[in-house]
Amino acid sequence: MTYSLNSWIKETEKKTKIKLDSYYISFVYLGIIMRLQMKKTVIFDLDGTLADIDIRRDKSLKPNGKLDWDIFAAPNSIMDWDTPNEPVIKMAQMFAKEGFKIVIFSGRNDRGFVATNHWLTKHNVPFDLLVLRPDKFKANSWPIADGNPATDEMRFMPDEILKKKMLDTFVDIDDVFLVVDDRDKVVKMWRDLGLNTFQVAPGDF
């Protein structure tokens, strides 16, 4: 909603029945404008950032050393083997307490959408929006009917391209205060967009 200064003065005086002096008006109105202009969204990655997935990755390896994606992406694997990255979760909690919108963008397959929600709740991770790689549950993991709908190619799309699409679809880039991620290629993409990005760990993969 957009207010002119005069309309704001009239509405406030009507509600409070107090005649506002010019100094008070200038101070309060400036505060309102500054708050409206503040960037209020923080984007978090999930695997390797909010969640430590080392155990799940190790237990999902085949004898030849390659990852068994069926085991790795299984909901019970997420719930049983992922551990919380407490410092990063604490960061999310602090931002949420200050009124920031917490958005989680992950390249994790949406077969684990329900389990991921349960895991986040179990470990007290605050979030306003969770977006996963769309596959089987697009209505939940990519909740948009038009504009930038989920497509089949997103199933195997590189994370840095997928997350750019997530940004374009779900968040106003001008509202992003900070991004927290771990993968080098994704961090580079965020920074190339001019977004302040905190890299929680080396991620050359």
Predicted regions, residues:
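Non-catalytic pre-domain segments flanking phosphatase-related domains
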Residues: 3-8, 12-46, 54-57
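Alpha-helical substrate-recognition element adjacent to the catalytic core
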Residues: 36-138
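Amphipathic coiled-coil/heptad-repeat helices and related helical stalk/stem segments
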Residues: 84-88, 160-163, 183
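Hydrophobic anchor at the start of a short beta-strand
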Residues: 102, 127, 177, 197-198
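Substrate-recognition "cap/lid" segment bordering the active-site pocket of phosphatases
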Residues: 110-177, 186
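Acidic, Mg2+-coordinating phosphoryl-transfer loop and its flanking beta/alpha structural elements
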Residues: 167, 178-205
